[in-house]
Every structure is written in structure tokens, then in C-alpha cells.
Amino acid sequence: MLNNFNKFVASSVSMVYLAVLSWATAYAYGWGQAAYHGYPWWHVVQGGSMIARSLAYVCVVSMVFVIGYLIGYQAFKFIKRFFGLLHVSWGASHLGFVKIFILLVIVSTPIMLLLYFYVGILSSYRLMGCVLSILAISLVCHKFGRAISFSIRLRELMSNEKYYQIFMAFIFVYVVVSAFSIGYLRSAFFTGYDIIEVENRPYYILVANGDEEFILGENIKHNSHFIFFNRKTLNHYTIHITPSPYLPYKNQLSAQIYHQE
């Protein structure tokens, strides 16, 4: 009876974790778009469809991590065995570099894949820049972090409660931060913005805000105002971006509703 209750509690906590993570991912993605286009982040609204896509994103990232770990683990075993057969001292002393490189490849792969799916463009020079960055970070971490020993197997991670909680916290932070980054980068790389006319003036459809609204702007970036257009009722209101009198820096902005129809 107690085991069944513990399983029920564990499954309930897992469901709550997935729900909170999906909600946070959806809003982090929207905040990334807001950061690029320049409208206030507190106007971001996400509908049920975006929450569902965020849940799918969480599942995909988890699968990529597991598959990447298994592939990386087998690749590391092969490299270690290869250098052992050749009796190469360089390989034995630099296996830590290989570990860090494989780990960074696993961490960066979901972002690269989702950027490709969302934007549709992943140029060779950007991919090469990513690989070179991973190599540089791996070299620096290996050079200055030799005193730190870090080795956790997948079975040990899932069975040890402390490691499992740290892993789940890492997944939460990673997914939320990557969702924010993808929202920002997708807006920066996206080239297919639609145009709609409001009051006989053309506006870019920057993002879909929730299930009913479009956020419109005269430019992709650096707009002085934004129109929130309800595509069901065809009503809209305008947000003007003005310098806040309570902040010492002119580049810090506040928003106010200008008019509503």
C-alpha cells in the first residue's frame, strides 16, 4: 500500500514538473521574441497550443539527451580503447578533453536542431563556428579544470536521489534558457514576415500573441509603438514605448496604452 502511494506521489510530482516546465518554456520563448522585437515582456500571452508545443519540445530535448548520452558513451569507450591499443600517451592524458567535447555536443545539439526546424536555415559557417566554439570551450575547461573530477553514469544518475534532483534542475534551467535563446534567434534569423494593413498603413506581423492576438510593428526592430490586433474581433489597441521618468537610463523603457478600438 505504501509503495503504491509513493508511486502515486512520484507520478503526480512528475506531472506537475512537466506542466510547470511546459508553461515556463512557452513563456521563455515568448520573452525571447519580445526581447528581440522590443515590446514589453509583460504583454506576452501564450495559448494552449503553445503550451502543448512546449511539452513536445521538452520531450524531444529529453530524448536527444538520452540518445546523445548513449552515443557519446559508446564513442568515448571506442576512443579510449583505440588509444589504449596504440599505447598513445597523448590520448590517455587528454581523454578529459574528449569527455568535455562530447558533453558540449550533447548539450548544444537540441538548440541546433530546433533552430533548423524553426528557421529552416543553418548555414555552414554558423555550424562551423559552433563546432569551433565547442572545441575552444572544451580546451579551456580541460586546461583549467583538471583538478575537478566529474563522472556520473546514467544508472547512477537515475538511482541516486541527489543526482536525480540536480539533473532535473539542470533540465529545467537548460530548457528554459534554450527556449528564450531560440525565441530571440528565430526572430533574428526569420525572413518570412507577413504584412497586414491597419488603418491603411502596412504593419509586420511580428508574433502571434496567444490564440487570438497578433503583435504588429512598422519595423522588425526599433519600433516606437506596437499594435495588438485581435484577429477574431478585428479590434486593436496601440502600445507606445516611452522613456520612463523614474529610471536614470534613457534606454530603459515603459509602456502605456495609447488608444483602443
Swiss-Prot record:
It comes from the Bacteria. This is Protein TfpB. It comes from Moraxella bovis.
